[in-house]
Amino acid sequence: MNNFKSTALGLVKWIGLIALSLLINAAPMLFLRLGKNLPIYAEILLVALYLILVYLIFRSLWQRYQKRVPEEKKKFKLSGKDIGFAFLFFFFARVAAIAGVYLNLILSGNSQTSNDSAIQGLGGMMSSQHIFFALLFVATIAFIAPIMEELIFRGFGTAFFFKNNQKVLPAIVTSVVFTLPHITQLTEFPIYFALGLVLYLSYARRGNIKDSMLVHILNNL
C-alpha cells in the first residue's frame, strides 16, 4: 500500500513538473506571438522577470533533485573524456533524427515534424524591433529547454520510480513520456523516442544528469 501511495505521489509530482516545463518552454513563444506592440521597456522587463523566475525554479528543483542523488555521484565533473562521450551521443542523436525524418517522410509525406515546423514559424517572426524576445527565444531553445527537460524527464523521472540498478524500463518509460509532448502525429513518435533513448543512455552511462543536459544542448544548437 505504501509503495502504491509513493508511486501515485511521484506520478502526480512528475506530471506537475512536466506541465511546468511546458509552460517555461512556451512563454518565450507567447512573447513573440503576442508582444509585437509592446514598448522596449516592457519587453526588457518581461525577459528579465522570465529569466529570474526560471533561475529560481531551476535552483529549487536542482536542490530537491540533489537530495535523491547518491553522494558519490554528486562529485562527478565533466572531464575531457565525458565531453567526448557527449559528442559521440550527439552523433547518435543526429543519426536517429535523420533516420526518423526519412521514416516520417515515407509514412506521412512530411519532411519535418510539427514541432520543428512550429519552431521555424516562430523563428520567422523574430525581428530586430523585438531583439530581446528573439534572443530569449533562441536561448530557451538552445539552453533553457534542454536543461529543464533533462532534469524533469530523465532526472526526476528516474528518481521518482526506479532503482539505481534498473536501466531498460526507465529508458523506455522516460523516453515515451519525453516523446508525447513533442509530437502531434504517431508517425513522429520514432524520431523523439529514439532521441529520448540516446539522451537516457548518455545519462545512464554514469548516472550524471549533466551528461544528458550537454548532449541535449548540442542537439538543439
Where on the chain are the PLM-derived regions?
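N-terminal, membrane-interfacial amphipathic/helix-forming hydrophobic leader that caps
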Residues: 1-103
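Hydrophobic alpha-helical transmembrane segments
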Residues: 11-15, 44-45, 83-88, 123-145, ...
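Functionally important transmembrane alpha-helices
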Residues: 26-29, 172-175, 179-183, 187-221
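Membrane-interface starts of transmembrane alpha-helices
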Residues: 34-50, 132-137, 165-174, 184, ...
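Membrane-interface interhelical connector segments
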Residues: 105-130
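Membrane-interface helix/loop boundary segments of multi-pass membrane proteins
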Residues: 148-173, 201-211
